[in-house]
Structures are given as structure tokens and as C-alpha cells.
């Protein structure tokens, strides 16, 4: 019988836990009442590795990231759970204590670089701010550090460009500046929220390569938020698949993508048109995700699931172990485990930027 336990990853190589999220709940206040937008989300990010939060728009990926970083909008609040950064629960700390812990140890890269940067300050000033606040440097010292950061992330002529404003940079260069800001204090954890949004394919490849290099140089944990299965296949070690505010499957990318044990994950993988034949109908998941204010009783995926049964409408499945370090929230995950003899080939999921580099 499959266990309902959720143990830490057990591997021969010892992994150091940087971030452990357990049972995270996030609520939003609306004119019609409180809406649960993140529900009992749990995952672990390890030093030197990348965990991907994967799912459709509105599934709760970015809200989860904001809750971890303490950047929720005023109408949103953490309603429960533990966010432990290097063993310290950020949810139990006041604002000042949280900044002291998370400020130097956690960096975040937002998806819209133009709006994330302040238009009235030079990029050198903005990059140097972290050094002035957390390292006590003066303006001259901070500027030198900012220039070195710009050089490190591949911005040409950093001594000159440090005096430029955000609008004077291309989209790709602005994203590099955001990444530089995020890693300025050598954080233990980097959250990258859709870091290649609105960038062309070539620039996407460059940004992902930069993040990969910085992760290796700093030996930091990375939480990568994306809806792109190809990016997950190439960049992540582990994946947590989210749907309607819930993690429905979690495990090593190679395992989850080759033998998914949740119908939603399986549907996503089958929707990739890698092996599509011209003229044939493309595979897709019918319907739309439920409105978060009207989540049905039972399984959150029931209205779109080809395996739905009476129990799915009555009882919400808990995450349970389906394989080594793999967990699925499905009443019929054992059926999918049996079907894994004909697995989806994760090597067939290739990102455009990978093909561009061939």
C-alpha cells in the first residue's frame, strides 16, 4: 500500500535543505468574502539545485513565491503553514526580523523587469542599494560593487551603463540587471518568477544560461516559476505541479516527466506537440481551471479529468507517495503507476532556446 507520509528526499548524496515549505495557505480578501488561493502547499528546495513550480496561469505559483518572500499584496495574507529558510520559520517573524534574515539570504527575480525597476533612479544606484543597507557601504563603495555585478551578469561597459536608467536598456539587459540585484548579497535562495517572459528565444536561452551559471557559482537553491514544460525539463532537478492553488504532483523531473502519476501532469505532457502529425488534432486538456472562489468539494481537477469517479467528487485526495521521492494527489495514481510501462519520454520535450543553440 502506498504511504501517506511525506518524507524528505532520501538519496545516496546528502542534500542540504535551504527552503522547506510545509502546509502553506494563502487567503485573499474580496468584496464577496475570503478566497483560499494557495492551499496546503509543501515542497523543499535544496542547495545547488533547482525546484520548478509548474502550472497554468492563476494556479498559485506566483502567489506562493510572494508569500515566501514576504511580498504579498495588502489584500492577501498567509493563513497557515511554515516557510523555513535555513531552518528559521519566516512566518513567525515580525517585519524587521524577517528582513534581517531574508534580506541577505533570499533573492527574487520578477517577470516584468521594466516595472520592477524604479524608472527615476540609475541602475547603478538601484544595484548599490543592497550594499548600502545590508553591508554598510558608502555610495562610492556601493557603486563599485554595482559595476562589478553588472560585469558579472554580462552587461557591456558597466562603468558607463551604471549611470543609465532602466528605459535605456533592452528587455534582456533589464532582466540581467534584475538578476544582478537578486544575487547581489550571495543569497542562499533565489526565486525566479517567469524570468524569460516577453523575451525572444535567443535572449531566453541567455537568461537561463546565466541563472544556471550563477546557481553553480553561488551553490544556491533556485525556485523557478514557469508554465513552460521544456524549461522545466532542461533546467530543474525537481518539480511541483500546481493546479487551482494545490500541488497535485511532486518529485524529480526525470521521474515525473517520464512516468506521471497525476492525470493533470499526464495531460500537460501529452499536450506538447513534439510528435504531432500534420493534419491530426493536437492533444489538449478540455475545459478551464475552476474559479478559486468556487472550488468544488473533492478533487480540484475533477471537472477536467478523464479518470473522474464518484469518490473524486466526494473526497479530496491527499498527496501520497507513488514512487521514490514522487508524490501525487490522485485517488487513482496507482493506475497511472501501472501504466508507466509506456512512459512519456521527457527527452522529447525540448525548449526552443535549446534548439536555437544546436
What are these regions (language model features)?
Residues 19-21, 38, 101:
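Conserved structural motif at the start of ABC-family nucleotide-binding domains
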Residues 184-188:
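A short, proline-enriched helix->beta-strand linker immediately N-terminal to the Walker B motif
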